[in-house]
């Protein structure tokens, strides 16, 4: 059972959250999509919204089979929610980055303590590649979030459980990861600890 955060722990967590938002959201809405991938991804999502065809991504009049549709669905939903492609095209990556940080913090807090959670999330936030990708309209932040969520759910079940809802959620996240990118098999690797535990 988790103990409530002390006032100093709560302040530290809020400082980390504010820093994460400041770092990841800096410049949000102030730029247009940058070549090579961002304009293409936004165009595919925009075409989904305009045509109503959400199953088969298209670029112009051509089918766009290069990537699975899940990320384009997120971009399209963000565009519908904000009404502005300039404000929406970075939203899935921003939310995925913040979600990944929260999952890392919460899992470390549950396994050890709040201090470990703060250090773990800080360690992720200072990785240049993480920040770089979270500030771009790329599929990778979404894949990282889904992979982290898959591991989070499975580890909550295996190490802190039984927690079958979290296990099912982790498996579902692994499945979404599979349809998010061409190398989507990576989230399925999250199932290896469970298979190992069952085999033992």
PLM regions and their residue ranges:
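Membrane-integral, polyisoprenol-dependent glycosyltransferases
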Residues: 2-200
């Amino acid at each position: 059972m988790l103990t409530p955060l002390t006032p100093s722990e709560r302040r530290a967590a809020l400082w980390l959250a504010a820093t994460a938002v400041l770092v990841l959201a800096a410049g949000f809405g102030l730029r247009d999509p940058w070549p090579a991938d961002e304009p293409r991804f936004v165009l595919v999502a925009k075409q989904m919204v305009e045509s109503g065809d959400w199953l088969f991504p298209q670029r112009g009049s051509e089918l766009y089979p290069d990537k699975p549709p899940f990320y384009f669905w997120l971009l399209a939903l963000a565009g519908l929610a904000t009404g502005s492609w300039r404000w929406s095209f970075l939203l899935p990556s921003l939310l995925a980055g913040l979600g990944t940080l929260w999952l890392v913090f919460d899992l470390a807090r549950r396994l050890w303590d709040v201090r470990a959670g703060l250090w773990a999330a800080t360690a992720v936030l200072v990785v240049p590649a993480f920040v770089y990708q979270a500030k771009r309209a790329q599929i990778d932040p979404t894949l990282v979030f889904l992979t982290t969520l898959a591991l989070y759910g499975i580890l909550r079940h295996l190490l802190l459980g039984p927690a079958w809802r979290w296990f099912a959620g982790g498996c579902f996240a692994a499945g979404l990861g599979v349809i998010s990118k061409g190398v989507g098999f990576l989230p399925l690797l999250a199932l290896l600890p469970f298979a190992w535990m069952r085999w033992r």
